[in-house]
From Swiss-Prot:
Biased amino acid composition, Basic and acidic residues: 574-589
Listed PANTHER family: RNA-BINDING (RRM/RBD/RNP MOTIFS) (PTHR24009), ZINC FINGER CCCH DOMAIN-CONTAINING PROTEIN 22 (PTHR24009:SF47)
UniProt keyword annotation of Coiled coil present: yes
Superkingdom of the source species: Eukaryota
Alphabetical UniProt keywords: Coiled coil, DNA-binding, Metal-binding, RNA-binding, Zinc, Zinc-finger
Any one GO molecular-function label of the UniProt entry: RNA binding
Protein name according to UniProt: Zinc finger CCCH domain-containing protein 22
Coiled-coil portions: 487-522
ZnF locations on chain (C3H1-type): 233-260
PROSITE patterns: RRM (PS50102), ZF_C3H1 (PS50103)
Biased composition (Polar residues): 613-624
Residue pairs linked by disulfide bridges in the UniProt entry: none
UniProt cross-references to SUPFAM superfamilies, sorted A to Z: CCCH zinc finger, RNA-binding domain, RBD
Phylogenetic placement of the source organism: Eukaryota, Viridiplantae, Streptophyta, Embryophyta, Tracheophyta
């Protein structure tokens, strides 16, 4: 319960007691502003506390008290039957009757209902304390000097000390040091009654110097107003440890043991009210734990930060109880409707399994990943309203950018995620097609996927991490997308990485282009060699298919048809070959040069005696060596020079000297080429 609801409860209670002056009294209480804790305590406190506050407010506003009700003269109710008194099971003290705190007591009535004590002393220990209880019938005299901490006047010292005590209550087990009591207060005057002594108005006090064990908690709702008396022998709440099988406190436990239905009659609250009390108690404790270190920064315990795990555990337990209550309610409804299948489905799991509890602590199991078009116009509220059909939605996160195409939805229970994924795709939100995918934490991707990614994506960052890895988006995106500064930093980082990648890609392209240029240069050299090989493979004379006596290919000399020029052509062949060998093969070894010279000499020595004689076997081998070694040189020189050319086709006309064979038997092309290249006589044309 928050302060707003507590204020409404207090106003309704004041209006029930004094409807004429309720608005003025409530206005004064709001103007004084004693804090949310005091308002909540007043909302759940006994009527004696409320009467005291109203009496003090009427005194300050100079208002007349309302006429007493007819039942005010009734006898006092024993403490054992008062519904507003505290009770604890197995407290070790028997019940002791005491007057009701609503009675108009004498100045010694403070002894029967001591509000300020922590030692839980008996009535005999506090008899004789002459303090006065403020009540509607006794609100004058010295009441302002002994005002409760809710009042601003006459109780400033009390108020400061009480606030100090509330801040220290959770930092020390046994209270403060007994050697430093509060000045102005006796230990005997600051005792609160035990469980059966009738005091329950102010559950906190100043009895630190009494040596008794101090309460470590402030006035929680479950200790103020909803418990049976100590004579009943039980409290209002069952023991959870005993229900699970074993309670370490044994008979001294403050909660109920056993399955007796009569022992649970003191539980006057339903489950919703109990959860509100637990939440309120948790909030009060956390607030006091925050105030304690702030009030005493130099204390040994004040500098210790609060444990965040305790708050997480409390909230998780509250969620677990709420889920269990919802399942019980659903099972009860299914039983009432007569559906056994539905009842079995809900009753099969009365509590959360350990796996489900772990999944509750892990937000990844309660999230889904959404993808949708960039031109979608729906908002986070629309997404939350749509998916609330399947279950309660905890959070919706859609990145704030111009072209949004993904988002995340977090649910309260992981079962909702399973239900949505089982339904399949697509989903339509505001006429936009939305696809749902399971949420995967990129930090837990198997190694094989990382290896594949490392093979196909180059590492570009100096730290060795791939900037294109979506680890940043999913692992840190939940927090980074919520803050614009972090989003800008992430965008700048990605831009820098993209520029780095572009620069490295450009360098790779330039390096590849250089390699291609080198390959092209090598290709030009290879083309020259290929041209030589092609010239070698050309067949100069080819036989006529029909046995014609005229060859299809002849060798011609374009110089004038005199014998001197033809002889000069032979010398040109040798000079050209020498020039090619000398200019193109400068790095040729001496052995290769001598080999070429020997081949030429052997060729000259193997010339036949008569030009009309057929070549010998030795000359044939020499001719073969000549053709294999020097044909490329001749072909290359013939391409560049204008003296010798090779023409194909039949030449029927005159004007060109033809080398005609003497008979119809056409020699082999190798022999013909060897003989035709050998011009040793002064004749114009030599016929075979």
């Amino acid at each position: 319960m928050d302060a707003y609801e507590a204020t409404k409860v207090v106003f309704s209670r004041i209006q029930a007691l004094d409807p004429d002056h309720a608005a003025k009294i409530m206005g004064l209480l709001l103007i004084q502003d004693h804090g949310d804790k005091e308002m909540i305590r007043l909302a759940f406190g006994p009527e004696a506390l409320l009467h005291s506050v109203m009496a003090q407010a009427r005194k300050e506003l100079a208002l007349l008290p309302p006429p007493p009700p007819p039942s005010s003269s009734s006898p006092t109710v024993p403490a054992a039957h008062s519904p507003f008194l505290l009770s604890r099971q197995n407290s070790g003290r028997g019940p002791a009757p005491s007057p009701s705190p609503l009675s108009a007591s004498s100045p010694s009535s403070w002894a029967q209902a001591q509000p300020f004590s922590r030692s839980n002393g008996s009535v005999d220990e506090v008899v004789g304390a002459g303090e006065e209880l403020i009540s509607p019938a006794n609100s004058g005299g010295g009441a302002a000097a002994n005002a409760p901490p809710f009042f601003p006047r006459g109780g400033d010292v009390l108020l400061d000390d009480f606030q100090l005590q509330e801040q220290l209550a959770f930092l020390n087990e046994g209270g403060v040091n007994p050697s430093h009591p509060l000045q102005g207060f006796d230990g005997a005057e600051c005792r609160s009654p035990g469980p059966g002594e009738g005091g329950g108005m102010f559950p906190y006090g100043l009895g630190w110097a009494n040596g008794g064990p101090g309460h470590r908690r402030s006035a929680s709702v479950n200790e103020l107003c909803l418990g049976g008396g100590s004579s009943d022998g039980f409290g209002w709440k069952p023991c959870l440890y005993y229900a699970r099988g074993f309670c370490k406190n044994g008979s001294s436990c403050r909660f109920v043991h056993g399955d007796d239905a009569a022992a649970l009659t003191g539980a006057a609250m339903d489950a919703a009210t109990a959860e509100q009390q637990q939440c309120q108690d948790f909030l009060l404790r956390s607030k006091s734990q925050r105030l304690g270190p702030a009030a005493f920064p130099y204390s040994p315990t004040g500098s210790l930060p609060g444990s965040p795990s305790a708050a997480t555990k409390c909230l998780s337990l509250l969620l677990q109880q709420q889920h269990n209550d919802n399942q019980r309610a659903a099972a009860a409804a299914a039983l009432m409707l007569g559906g056994s299948d539905e009842a079995h489905k809900f009753m099969g799991r009365p509590r959360l399994d350990r796996v489900d509890f772990a999944s509750m602590m892990n937000p990844g199991s309660r999230q889904i990943y959404l993808t949708f078009p960039a031109d979608s116009t729906f908002r986070e509220e629309d997404v939350s309203n749509y998916f609330s059909i399947y279950g309660p939605v905890h959070d919706v996160r859609i990145p704030y950018q111009q072209k949004r195409m993904f988002g995340f939805v977090t649910f309260v229970y992981p079962e909702t995620v399973k239900l949505i994924l089982a339904k399949g795709n697509p989903h339509f939100i505001c006429d936009a097609r939305v696809l749902v995918k399971p949420y995967k934490e990129k930090g837990k991707v198997p190694d094989k996927y990382r290896k594949h990614q490392g093979d196909f994506s180059g590492c570009t960052t100096p730290t060795g991490l791939d900037g294109r890895d979506p680890f940043d988006l999913h692992q840190l995106g939940a927090r980074m997308l919520q803050h614009s500064n972090s989003t800008n930093e992430m965008m700048l980082r990605r831009k820098l990485e993209e520029q780095q990648q572009a620069a490295e890609l450009q360098q790779a392209i330039e390096l590849h282009s250089r390699r291609l240029m080198d390959l092209q240069l090598l290709d030009l050299k290879n083309r020259a060699a290929a041209a030589v090989t092609t010239a070698m493979a050309m067949t100069i004379p080819t036989a006529n298919a029909f046995g014609s006596s005229q060859p299809l290919a002849t060798t011609m000399v374009e110089s004038p048809p005199d014998s001197g020029e033809q002889l000069k052509g032979t010398g040109y062949f040798t000079e050209e070959r020498k020039m090619v060998n000398g200019g193109g093969d400068k790095e040729e070894s001496a052995g290769e040069a001598s080999l070429n010279a020997d081949s030429d000499q052997s060729l000259e020595h193997n010339l036949p005696d008569s030009p009309f004689a057929s070549p010998t076997k030795s000359s044939v081998s020499a001719h073969q060596s000549f053709t294999t070694t020097d044909t490329g040189v001749v072909a290359t020189s013939s391409c560049s020079a204008s003296h010798v050319g090779i023409s194909a086709g039949t030449n029927a006309g005159g004007g060109i000297n033809h080398l005609r064979p003497s008979t119809l038997d056409i020699p082999s092309p190798r022999d013909f080429f060897s003989v035709s290249s050998r011009l040793a006589s002064d004749h114009g044309a030599i016929g075979m």
